[in-house]
Curated annotation (Swiss-Prot):
The keyword Cell membrane does not apply. SMART domains: Elp3. Its cofactor is [4Fe-4S] cluster. It comes from Streptomyces avermitilis (strain ATCC 31267 / DSM 46492 / JCM 5070 / NBRC 14893 / NCIMB 12804 / NRRL 8165 / MA-4680). This is Ribosomal protein uS12 methylthiotransferase RimO.
């Protein structure tokens, strides 16, 4: 009988990383590894790192060091780094952090079981030398689908040579290109990867260099994975990628998302479909119409504004201004008055003036956003912005970050108060003795946004869609009272 091998996956960063972790979990379980929840109970602790900004990289290093500490007094024998930080730095990370017994890039994912076994046996798998993954796919989007078969794209394709009899609950059951995937929690919400990579050239962002050029998954693959997730009890799927508004451009149809969304909404068992990561400059009337008028599609707009002062946006290699952004929001709300909108912003960008900051504050005040993320600028190596002059002192960036963060906190609390009296459709996500029943309405995405606190959990169950009336707020969170007969009909859920 083969020796029992255990592995734990520790996931940091965004929802895309969560999908990648479930792919790794699926590959490992298919090859006989036993998944455990806690790293201290695992032979190998795999840390799926984030390489987005400095704070995220620090969190990733801390998680690796914490896992390494387990080797002295527990079952853990090896610690392995995967994910964006591992891909971005490769050999450099391995040399700087000897506590990690292995640093694996995206090209290692299809052979993750063999890689971990080698490391567990005391062997060494040489870390890769990082390369610009944008160069792995053709410049022309039309040529990428055929070339993509030879490029590692986490979350896109099934590995070769899988055993015919996969363990129960392990994808794919719904098509040859659905990714091998094992859910790591019992949440009624799951992310589905719509695409990978990004063709935008924002001057502050390094993500395209290690995630590559934009490439869409085929609609049949996305539908197949969504059906499988519904069979696992998922009620809400959130479509993720670096830029969902570009979906289909490499498949010959830039409006493919408008066609796909109604099909996803018709999947049996799915109560809500949410779209994240939308670019304001790529929004189009047809997409707004589908997002605001299709049953079971959340009227939710995760718009990447980043700033609103024209000079700063130009330096960021982005487009728009305060008035155009406000006009976009007016268009959305004219079609769906209760639509949810969230965005992230960078303050202290090189060359940002007090007038620029005031313009951003004007936009934030007028935008009535439901959730706001604010980040202070810091150089990211390999980016155009890192070469800019006119850098602001760190204390100036910190002061502006604190100033805009305070304003953002006030504004999202005000926006929550505006929702008092509204009727919302809430997916119940957890029920416990301490917090009671908690869920999320259409305008609230997992992790990043607020939530709904029910006044009573009586009769509620996790995964149930409930109609409730907002009766109060706690900061950005809503307090809501379930309405009598509040099980929402699936045809109405999401509207």
């Amino acid at each position: 009988m083969p020796e029992r091998r255990t592995v734990a996956l520790v996931t940091l960063g965004c929802a895309r990383n969560e999908v990648d972790s479930e792919e790794l979990a699926g590959r490992l379980e298919a090859d006989g590894w036993q998944l455990v929840e806690d790293a201290e109970d695992a032979d190998v602790a795999v840390v799926n790192t984030c390489g987005f900004v400095e704070a995220a990289k620090k969190d990733s290093v801390d998680a690796l060091l914490e896992a390494n500490d387990l080797k002295g007094h527990g079952r853990t024998q090896a610690v392995v780094a995967v994910g964006c930080m591992a891909e971005r730095y490769g050999k450099e990370l391995a040399e700087a952090l000897p506590e990690a017994d292995g640093v694996l890039g995206f090209d290692d994912y299809t052979n993750i079981s063999d890689r971990l076994q080698t490391i567990l046996n005391g062997g060494i798998h040489a870390a890769h030398t990082p390369r610009d993954r944008r160069k792995l796919l053709p410049i022309s989007p039309a040529e990428r689908q055929s070339a993509g078969a030879d490029v590692a794209l986490p979350g896109h394709g099934a590995p070769e040579g899988l055993p015919e009899d996969l363990p129960e609950g392990l994808a794919p059951e719904s098509g040859p290109r659905a990714p091998l995937r094992r859910r790591l929690d019992g949440s009624p919400v799951a992310s589905v990867k719509l695409a990978s990579g990004c063709d935008r050239r924002c001057s502050f962002c390094a993500i395209p260099s290690f995630r590559g050029s934009f490439i869409s998954r085929r609609p049949s693959d996305v539908l197949g994975e969504t059906r499988w997730l519904a069979e696992q009890g998922v009620k809400e799927v959130m479509l993720v990628s670096e830029n969902n508004t570009s979906y289909g451009k490499d498949l010959g149809d830039i409006r493919l998302l408008e066609t796909l969304l109604p099909e996803l909404a018709e999947v049996d068992g799915i109560e809500r479909v949410r779209v994240s990561y939308l670019q304001p400059a790529e929004m189009r009337p047809g997409l707004i119409d589908v997002l605001t008028s299709t049953p079971k599609i959340a009227p939710y707009f995760d718009l990447s504004f980043q700033h609103s002062a024209p000079d700063v946006l130009r330096a960021m290699r982005r487009f728009g201004d305060t008035d155009r952004f406000l006009e976009l929001l007016d268009t959305i709300r004219s079609k769906a008055p209760q639509a949810g909108v969230r965005s992230n912003f960078i303050v202290g960008f090189p060359g940002e003036t007090e007038a620029d900051l005031a313009e951003l504050e004007r936009f934030l005040t007028g935008a009535r956003l439901d959730a706001i993320g604010v980040f202070g600028y810091s150089d990211e190596e390999g980016t155009e912005a890192a070469t800019y002059g006119h850098k602001l002192d760190e204390d100036v960036v910190a002061a502006r970050l604190a100033r805009v963060s305070r304003l953002a906190e006030e504004l999202v609390a005000q926006r929550a108060e505006e929702r008092v009296g509204e009727t919302v459709h809430v997916l119940v996500e957890s029920i416990d003795d301490e917090e009671g029943a908690v869920g999320r309405a259409e305008h609230q995405a997992p992790e990043t946004d607020g939530q709904v606190l029910f006044t009573s959990g009586e009769g509620l169950t996790v995964g149930r869609m409930v109609e409730a009336k907002v009766v109060g707020t706690e900061g950005v969170d809503l307090v809501a009272e379930p309405l009598p007969g509040s099980l929402v009909c699936t045809e109405e859920a999401g509207r």
